[in-house]
């Protein structure tokens, strides 16, 4: 794997109280991936570590995101959303994407850690 290319990942998270219970809190998260390089990069896979407020931790890995493996041309953005539940607050998510270029090189692109809470940190989190 090569060093991380100049690909920016931004995250917004929203608590969904109407679909939550005291034992299981539901959150929607919105991810935007921006390719700031001069090359095209394809999102090959994802790796998430999700930690509940009680310390329970689990990992989610798989190909692409939401059933897609988007190809990001130079300057392009890709946005998707998904959902996660945690049993105890506050929770936390973090991880990385594995991206591939046209020459077969792969690179890990970090996903900034974000908090899962009823009153989440305000604003958008950015990571280069």
From Swiss-Prot:
Disulfide-linked positions: none
InterPro entries: ApaG_domain, ApaG_sf, Uncharacterised_ApaG
Pfam family, one: DUF525
Ranges of residues in domain ApaG: 1-123
Gene Ontology BP, a term: error-free translesion synthesis
SUPFAM superfamilies in UniProt: ApaG-like
Protein known as: Protein ApaG
Organism: Deinococcus radiodurans (strain ATCC 13939 / DSM 20539 / JCM 16871 / CCUG 27074 / LMG 4051 / NBRC 15346 / NCIMB 9279 / VKM B-1422 / R1)
Gene behind this protein: apaG
